[in-house]
Amino acid sequence: MSTPGPLKPTLMSRLQLRPEFHRAIRALKLVELASAMLKVRPLRRTLPNGSRYRVRYGESLLMADEIFKREVYRDPFVDRPVRTFIDLGSNVGYFTCYAADRIGKGAIGLSVDANPKMAAETQWHIDHNGWSRVKGLWSVVGFPAEVAQAPFFLNPSNISGSATVLNPNIPAKGAQREITVPTVELDRAWRDHAGDAPVDVMKVDVEGFEVKVLETMPALLRRTHTVVLEWHKWITPREPVDEVLGRAGLRFVKVVTEDPHCGVAFYERPRG
């Protein structure tokens, strides 16, 4: 079994760590300018196995670099069969595209986001690629089954949002706005969609709500083979995540990438 080597930094990943880069972007309103241009003429790209994606937001350029070029979520796909996935916090749907492209047309997936624009963009990618067994949901996760709706906080001038506090260490690009979103019981939603199939890969990026989300689905985690998760340091350290996943039999393998604000960690169920 081979182990992927360390991620290679890209120009984009280096720049995002430099405060002067972010100051210049804000001063020149480069994200807003890029988003205006991309809204008129989105970038369209094709992945190695033929899946297609588009870029309609300036912020998505960094996300595309992380997922498609640096491949921060590649570990669950190395030296193991993968047929099913869950994308929690799908945003514009790039991990959904990455996973389905690696799996092939038979991919079975569930992609969830609480931001209505992001859920719609994820659904566009699903429909555009003809993934008949991948389902998109506009819902928020991490609440008890008896809670039908929950608040969700949007930053209207970019594509971020959270069921908890947005990162206070990064200046917001606009006034935060609260919306009400339907909740979803993920274990039931997965069974309705995929039956008794296990989850080969679960990707989690829920902007600081990681522990709350994981604690609401112990049964589903016990049927999950690998987890790749972004933890957000302004809410929680990684150790509580390790503990919740450990109770489900998922062991911490490594930190894939990390910066002062967040990190990506990989977990797996021991094989054999």
Whereabouts are the PLM-identified features?
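Phosphate/nucleotide-binding beta-alpha loop and adjacent structural elements of enzyme active sites
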Residues: 1-272
